[in-house]
């Protein structure tokens, strides 16, 4: 029987980001109780030797599974040390990979308070606006004019500790897209 390979998207991350992610997830599961129904699986509970932890987040009839790995092939720099994260959407037997922005949007929709259409109307009428967006990482796009006006009226309140964000977990120097320099920064186009 031949070896069967399975290709996965794995985001290479720093070890400290994984520690921060795990501690934020545990805090919101056990202390603040905002992550109801989430399941944290330790490395000794998994069968795979390179899995350091798993977080199962129920999203409707499906589950979002964030798996952190250790001991993968070392990266280009010494601080990489082969730590990584994969994000899966599972529903029954179906599994697919999800990018961090989509994972944050799914978590935002199901678990954390956000502005509603009535909040904008209440702010315009001068009534107190109770719902605040408790998970701003779930908004990847630029807000509408009404949303920006409502945030200006209500104000933004920093949360301590912050809510766990998959985008923040995977964002790092080596995961960012290549940024091309403008015409002034390109020595080839400007000449010597």
Curated annotation (Swiss-Prot):
Q: State the protein's name.
A: Virion infectivity factor
Q: Which stretches does the entry tag as region Interaction with host APOBEC3G?
A: 40-44
As stated in the Swiss-Prot or TrEMBL entry, residues carrying the post-translational modification Phosphothreonine are: 96
Annotated membrane topology is:
Peripheral membrane protein
Any idea which residues bear Phosphoserine here?
A: 165
The protein's organism comes out as Human immunodeficiency virus type 1 group N (isolate YBF106) (HIV-1)
PTM per UniProt? Processed in virion by the viral protease. Highly phosphorylated on serine and threonine residues.
Question: Which region ranges are annotated with the description SOCS box-like?
Answer: 151-180
State what induces this protein: Expressed late during infection in a Rev-dependent manner.
> Main role?
Counteracts the innate antiviral activity of host APOBEC3F and APOBEC3G by promoting their ubiquitination and degradation. Acts as a substrate recognition component of an E3 ubiquitin-protein ligase complex: mechanistically, Vif hijacks a host cullin-5-RING E3 ubiquitin-protein ligase complex (ECS complex) and the transcription coactivator CBFB/CBF-beta to form an active E3 ubiquitin-protein ligase complex that targets APOBEC3G and APOBEC3F for polyubiquitination, leading to their degradation by the proteasome.
* Miscellaneous information on this protein: Vif-defective viruses show catastrophic failure in reverse transcription due to APOBEC-induced mutations that initiate a DNA base repair pathway and compromise the structural integrity of the ssDNA. In the absence of Vif, the virion is morphologically abnormal.
Residues that bind Zn(2+), according to the entry?
Answer: 108, 114, 133, 139
GO MF annotation list:
metal ion binding; RNA binding
Domain of life where this protein originates: Viruses
Question: Which region ranges are annotated with the description Multimerization?
Answer: 151-164
Region (Disordered), start-end ranges = 160-192
Record-linked InterPro entries: Vif
Q: Its family? A: Belongs to the primate lentivirus group Vif protein family.
């Amino acid at each position: 029987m031949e070896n069967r390979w399975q290709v996965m998207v794995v985001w290479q991350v720093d070890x400290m980001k994984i520690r921060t992610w795990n501690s934020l997830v545990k805090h919101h599961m056990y202390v603040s109780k905002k992550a109801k129904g989430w399941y944290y699986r330790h490395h000794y509970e998994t069968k795979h030797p390179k899995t350091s932890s798993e977080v199962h987040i129920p999203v409707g009839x499906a589950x979002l599974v964030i798996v952190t790995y250790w001991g993968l092939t070392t990266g280009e720099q010494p601080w990489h040390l082969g730590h990584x994260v994969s994000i899966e959407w599972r529903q029954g037997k179906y599994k697919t990979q999800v990018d961090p922005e989509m994972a944050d949007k799914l978590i935002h929709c199901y678990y954390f308070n956000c502005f509603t259409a009535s909040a904008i109307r209440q702010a315009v009428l001068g009534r107190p606006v109770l719902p605040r967006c408790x998970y701003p990482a779930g908004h990847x796009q630029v807000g509408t004019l009404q949303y920006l006006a409502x945030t200006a009226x209500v104000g933004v309140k920093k949360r301590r500790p912050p809510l766990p964000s998959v985008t923040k977990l995977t964002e790092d120097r080596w995961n960012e897209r290549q940024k091309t320099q403008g015409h002034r920064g390109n020595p080839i186009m400007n000449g010597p």
